Each structure stands twice: as structure tokens, then as C-alpha cells.
UniProtKB/Swiss-Prot annotation:
Region described as Domain III, AAA+ region: spans on this chain: 130-346
Protein role: Plays an essential role in the initiation and regulation of chromosomal replication. ATP-DnaA binds to the origin of replication (oriC) to initiate formation of the DNA replication initiation complex once per cell cycle. Binds the DnaA box (a 9 base pair repeat at the origin) and separates the double-stranded (ds)DNA. Forms a right-handed helical filament on oriC DNA; dsDNA binds to the exterior of the filament while single-stranded (ss)DNA is stabiized in the filament's interior.
Organism the protein comes from: Salmonella gallinarum (strain 287/91 / NCTC 13346)
Subunit organization: Oligomerizes as a right-handed, spiral filament on DNA at oriC.
Alphabetized PROSITE patterns for the sequence: DNAA (PS01008)
Name by which UniProt lists this protein: Chromosomal replication initiator protein DnaA
Gene name as annotated: dnaA
Annotated region described as Domain II, given as residue ranges: 86-129
């Protein structure tokens, strides 16, 4: 069965759609053309419903373009295409090859050994999972800032080694990347208790490799890491400038992908922005799906505080949660740390948790936050980021090169300060509060539509909150 028709559709869709959308929703589909019906198989119901709702017209339009009146009927199903041949290919290939004579690679069974660190005799490796059972999808608070990352992680947990391999999550400190890594690990092991799932910080990989070299046990090291079912590595940016570690990880990465074993990586920045890491590795990081996690919006911050308080059997008034969330914006870890401090103070003093009590308990933290983020600082940072003058932000100029940064700065001022809309308008050349409101709504809309605007907003939030 030729997949040339679906290959043509894929090529056009890849040109028409943003790279993230294509990787997230179109690449996982498998196609089968039979009896003038093109069946598209989605890995789960979530992907099927999304593709049918968002891309049905695009796909039907392409079928009509390529086939005219002979265009096949389109059918969606959950599952995998019926297999008539056995063939393993690297997951980054968009479609399966049509040849049937290629031999399937066989994974070599690891030789026996009794444990990793003591190495004398070959044996089945003893796997250190290191997955934290407390971090699950159930206690991960979802919002706009992390919705796509959570959905992708959930799909990986349901179908490890499938479409999103590798999965690369990136974002600032304390935004939930590590939580999602553990959640995936727990999800995989819940479905398959004997799965070999290994979570680790990238520095542990380096330490293990150094130990293996010192003990003349590099083959055992390779066997250990290349025989896992899922490898979850946190903070991959720490591989920077470690050439031997990168070399070893490069070969481990290739071996795992060829074996359809799942890889999930996290970093504090976009793969191509990681300095000191080889281009061939950065290229492979993007073979699957790359998803950003942004700082949580106000509603999500409130939900995080309420859920954390509930886990501690603490009644947290809604207005208090809102007060804290409005003033602490940078990351989840900071929010949880502030709440723990409030709870501890309340336990020590026996006082009720009120806004006045929180203001007192977090006095130094709130003062520091207000000192760090001001409208003047936002204007200066945005002007430097877009390479314009602060005077341009305050001017009446309406060219896009000035208007868009001005809207961005206004939206950031609303997000990161406690100033009212009229106060923000005054700070931007005496503009009306409705202008500020329009700017905020425009940036919110563009963040949904434009990857570049979304990245700009995240980068500026990270800079201003650090």
C-alpha cells in the first residue's frame, strides 16, 4: 500500500502549520489507504478529537486538491494501523517506509550483573527508578501556562515510545517541569509495574559515566542506560561543555530511539539556545515534541495555593489566596514556599490566616518583589529587548515596531505590578485605561496565535522576575 498521498498531505501540512502544532497533532497520525478510504489512526481519543475538530477541513481540502473527484473518504480511529510488516524506524520519520525487506533491529539482552556500582560480573542491571511517587498528574494544577505540556506528558505516559519521542519540556525554574517528569514515570509504572523507568538529574548521568570510566566499566554503563524503557533526565543544560558526557549521551539517545524507548528531557531554555551543547544533540532534542511551560497566570496561581492548602488540611480564604497570587508571580516553587511560611507562622502563633496576617508574615518577600518589578523597570527591559528607546514606548507613534512592544510592556505591567489600568496608562504617555485594556487583550490573543509573541512574553517575564 502506497502512502504517497498521505506523504503529500504531510508535506503541505508541515508547510502550513506551526512546527509545534504539526509535531503535537499531525505527526502522531498513522495512515492506511484502502477501498478509497483514508483511515487516520490517532494514539488516543484526545488527539483524535482535536485533529477532527481543528484540522478536518485542512485534510479534506488537500485530498480534494490532490485527487479531485476521486478523493478518498476520510475516517478517524483510535489505535495503530494494522501491521502487515515488522519494521522499526526512528520516531522522527514522519511516515513509515514502504519497503518490506528491511530486517527489524533486535535489542541485545543485557548480560547479567548483580548491581551497578560494584561491577565484577555481567548481570541484569538493578534499576534505580528515583521516581517520586508524590508527583502525579492528579496533583499537578493545570492552567493555560502548562496545558500543552501536561497534555503531551499525559500522552507519553499512556503511550511511551510513541509519537512524542523525545519529549522536551523547557521553562524557568520552579514551573513544574520536574513534577511532570515524575508524573510520567508514575503513569508508565502504573500501567506496567515492571517497566524500567529511570529519573535523574543530568549531573547524575555525568557522575555515573565518570565512575564507570574510573572502574573500567563503561560497557556496563552503556548496557544500563540503553536497556531502560524510559529515561527521564532533568536540566539537560548541565551537559554544556562536557564533551565526553555529550558523546556518550549522543549514542545512548540514538540507541533508545531506535529501540522505541521513551526519552524525556527538561531544560531552562529552548534547545537551540543551550550554549556548549553540540549541534547534533540539539537537533535530536527537536526530533519529537518541544513544549514550553510558562509562568502560571493569576487564576492558576490561586488554584495552586488552594490545592496546596487543602493538601495540608488548612482552610485558606479565597481573598488571601488571591492576595498572595497577585503579588508573587514568578514560579510555583516561590508560591508554595510563601504558603508554607504563612502556615508555619499561623501554627506558631495560633492566629487566623487573614490578609493582614499574610502581609506581616511575608513582609520582606513582598517588599523585595515590589522593589524588583516596577513600571520603569518594565519599560527599560522591554525597550532593550526590542532595541527601541523608552521614549518610543511613551510616544504617540503607531508603527508596529513600536506599538507591539508598547502593548507588551502594558500587558507586563498589568501582570507583574499592582498598579491599576489608569495608573499604567498614565505611565505610558497619559493613555486612557481602555487603551491599556485593549493592549492586554491583544497580547493575550497573540500569545495563543504566535509562537514568537509567546516566547517574547515568557522571556520578558523570566527576565523581570529573576
Amino acid at each position: 500500500m502506497s502512502l504517497s498521498l498521505w506523504q503529500q498531505c504531510l508535506a503541505r501540512l508541515q508547510d502550513e502549520l506551526p512546527a509545534t502544532e504539526f509535531s503535537m497533532w499531525i505527526r502522531p497520525l498513522q495512515a492506511e489507504l484502502r477501498d478509497n478510504t483514508l483511515a487516520l489512526y490517532a494514539p488516543n481519543r484526545f488527539v483524535l478529537d482535536w485533529v477532527r475538530d481543528k484540522y478536518l477541513n485542512n485534510i479534506n481540502g488537500l485530498l480534494n486538491t490532490f485527487c479531485g473527484a476521486d478523493a478518498p473518504q476520510l475516517r478517524f480511529e483510535v489505535g495503530t494501523k494494522p501491521v502487515t510488516q515488522t519494521l522499526k524506524t526512528p520516531v522522527h520519520n514522519v511516515v513509515a517506509p514502504t519497503q518490506t525487506t528491511t530486517a527489524q533491529p533486535q535489542r541485545v539482552a543485557p548480560a547479567a550483573r548483580s548491581g551497578w556500582d560494584n561491577v565484577p560480573a555481567p548481570a541484569e542491571p538493578t534499576y534505580r527508578s528515583n521516581v517520586n511517587v508524590k508527583h502525579t498528574f492528579d496533583n499537578f494544577v493545570e492552567g493555560k501556562s502548562n496545558q500543552l505540556a501536561r497534555a503531551a506528558a499525559r500522552q507519553v505516559a499512556d503511550n511511551p515510545g510513541g509519537a512524542y519521542n523525545p519529549l522536551f519540556l523547557y521553562g524557568g525554574t520552579g514551573l513544574g517541569k520536574t513534577h511532570l517528569l515524575h508524573a510520567v514515570g508514575n503513569g508508565i509504572m502504573a500501567r506496567k509495574p515492571n517497566a524500567k523507568v529511570v529519573y535523574m538529574h543530568s549531573e547524575r548521568f555525568v557522575q555515573d559515566m565518570v565512575k564507570a570510566l574510573q572502574n573500567n566499566a563503561i560497557e556496563e554503563f552503556k548496557r544500563y542506560y540503553r536497556s531502560v524503557d524510559a529515561l527521564l533526565i532533568d536540566d539537560i543544560q548541565f551537559f554544556a561543555n562536557k564533551e565526553r558526557s555529550q558523546e556518550e549521551f549522543f549514542h545512548t539517545f540514538n540507541a533508545l530511539l531506535e529501540g522505541n524507548q521513551q526519552i524525556i528531557l527538561t531544560s531552562d531554555r529552548y534547545p537551540k539556545e543551550i550554549n556548549g551543547v553540540e549541534d547534533r544533540l540539539k537537533s535530536r532534542f527537536g526530533w519529537g515534541l518541544t513544549v514550553a511551560i510558562e509562568p502560571p497566570e493569576l487564576e492558576t496561581r490561586v488554584a495552586i495555593l488552594m490545592k496546596k492548602a487543602d493538601e495540608n488540611d488548612i482552610r485558606l480564604p479565597g481573598e488571601v489566596a488571591f492576595f498572595i497570587a497577585k503579588r508573587l508571580r514568578s514560579n510555583v516553587r516561590e508560591l508554595e514556599g510563601a504558603l508554607n511560611r504563612v502556615i508555619a507562622n499561623a501554627n506558631f502563633t495560633g492566629r487566623a490566616i487573614t490578609i493582614d496576617f499574610v502581609r506581616e508574615a511575608l513582609r520582606d518577600l513582598l517588599a523585595l518583589q515590589e522593589k524588583l518589578v516596577t513600571i520603569d523597570n518594565i519599560q527599560k527591559t522591554v525597550a532593550e529587548y526590542y532595541k527601541i528607546k523608552i521614549a518610543d514606548l511613551l510616544s504617540k507613534r503607531r508603527s508596529r515596531s513600536v506599538a507591539r512592544p508598547r502593548q507588551m510592556a502594558m500587558a507586563l505591567a498589568k501582570e507583574l505590578t499592582n498598579h491599576s489600568l489608569p495608573e499604567i496608562g498614565d505611565a505610558f504617555g497619559g493613555r486612557d485605561h481602555t487603551t491599556v485594556l485593549h493592549a492586554c487583550r491583544k497580547i493575550e490573543q497573540l500569545r495563543e496565535e504566535s509562537h514568537d509573541i509567546k516566547e517574547d512574553f515568557s522571556n520578558l517575564i523570566r527576565t523581570l522576575s529573576s
